[in-house]
Design a protein with these regions (language model features):
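N-terminal "arm"/small-domain region of PLP-dependent enzymes with the aminotransferase-like
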Residues: 1-41, 374
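Active-site phosphate-binding strand-loop segment of PLP-dependent enzymes
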Residues: 117-215, 220-222, 227
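Structured binding elements
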Residues: 106
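Phosphate-binding glycine-rich loop
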Residues: 40-87, 101-103, 111-113, 135-144, ...
Length: 399
């Protein structure tokens, strides 16, 4: 019987986790400083420093820390002027957070399929939908099927690789749309030399425990728009209008990151380059070692991209390999190697209405074939070689 392995389970001598944090820098020192000085809540020098260093890393003028990446997405949608009953184009092949954030503001997601080579939102499918399924009157763009206004595009950079953003930005310019980059899996990745989060009108990062750097839980909104940054700070601090009196003239949110967690983030940010190097080294060993196995397709890096390979996720072609991804997943977990499928595409989720969306056949295929392999920054060569050996042995046995 296959042992059930909990997400985020700690590593042990005979267990290889999917992704765990790497806390080996100044985390203890900075957190202790917060405790020693009693600066543990939502203001403090580490919050300021974490925002500053994230903005520098993203290549934007401003950054606003939030409690998580979903909160950053929620605020970004509000800044972009997305209203109830509007529609937002969003990647279908993604974790559910961006679709949920769209619903938080009363708007509706329109799911766009992935392109088959890099598994990111397909700009061609987005353009096809806007040109064929929408009506543009020179000032507003509306979905012909629902009658709703299209307000924004929310491309999600999945697995550490960028979406092809130039065509997305061109569509946004043509139809007066806002672009919200979901870079929650893309910190440190680059598109044509530009850091993710800096290409669209606003970008969002996540510092969840499985991300390339972590605060345990946290997020960040980045932008070059001073007015938006000021508004984000206002909304994330319960929309408080007076520094002394408790006066509120708008609905706000308790979304600010604590100084304690920001201290962790500062320490982690100091190690980001090292972490990216480790992720890319892990990806290279997987790619080279699995290259000759039938039906195993490695993730590809576009010539215009710099990927962090945050989560190494090959595709398993059942016809060529003789097995499907779920059988391989069970075999790995039976050998105490934590592997996971990718997310159910959002157009298949019963939580969201996809009736106004185009078809998404590529995402359906990717969902069936994808399997995420152990990708922790601290994954050693011996452990990774064991993962590779289990995969190779299982494919050989089944063929």
């Amino acid at each position: 019987m296959t042992e059930k392995l909990a997400p985020g389970a700690p590593p042990s001598a005979d267990f290889i986790p999917l992704i765990v944090p790497e806390l080996r820098g100044n985390e203890w020192k900075y957190v202790k400083d917060c405790l020693d000085t009693n600066w543990v809540s939502s203001v403090g020098s580490y919050v300021d420093r974490f925002e500053r260093t994230t903005a520098e890393r993203a290549g934007t003028k401003f950054a606003v820390a939030t409690v998580n990446g979903t909160a950053a997405l929620h605020i970004a949608l509000l800044l972009a002027g997305v209203q109830p009953e509007d529609e937002v184009l969003v990647s279908t092949l993604t974790f559910i957070a961006p679709a949920n954030a769209i619903r938080y503001v009363g708007a509706w997601p329109v799911f766009i399929d992935a392109e088959p080579k890099h598994l990111q939102m397909d700009p061609a499918r987005a353009a096809e939908f806007l040109e064929q399924d929408c009506r543009w009157d020179g000032t507003e763009l509306r979905n012909r099927h629902t009658g709703r206004r299209i307000k924004a595009i929310l491309p999600v950079h999945i697995l550490g690789h960028p979406v092809d953003l130039d065509p997305i930005m061109e569509l946004a310019s043509r139809y007066s749309l806002q672009v919200i980059e979901d870079a929650t899996e893309g910190l440190g990745a680059r598109y044509k030399g530009r850091n993710l989060g800096s290409v669209g009108h606003v970008g969002c990062f996540s510092f969840n425990g499985n991300k390339i750097i972590t605060t345990g839980g946290g997020g960040m909104l980045v932008t070059d728009n001073a007015e938006w940054a000021s508004r984000a700070r206002y909304l994330t601090t319960q929309a408080k209008d007076d520094p002394i009196e408790y006066v509120h003239n708008a609905v706000g949110y308790n979304y600010r990151l604590t100084n304690l967690l920001a201290a962790m983030g500062c320490a982690q940010m100091e190690q980001l380059n090292e972490f990216i190097e480790a992720k890319r080294r892990i990806a290279t060993l997987y790619r080279e070692s699995l290259a000759d196995l039938p039906g195993v397709r490695a993730p590809e890096e576009a010539e215009w991209a710099f990927s962090t390979f945050w989560m190494y996720t090959p595709l398993i072609d059942e016809k060529q390999s003789g097995i499907d991804s779920r059988r391989l997943l069970r075999e790995l977990n039976a050998n105490k190697i934590q592997a996971r499928p990718l997310w159910q595409p959002m157009h298949r989720s019963r939580a969201h209405d996809a009736s106004g969306s185009p078809s998404c056949p590529i995402a359906d295929v990717v969902h069936r074939q994808a399997i995420s392999l152990p990708s922790s920054v601290g994954l050693g060569p011996a452990s990774q070689s064991h993962v590779i050996e289990v995969i190779a042995s299982f494919l050989k046995k089944e063929n």
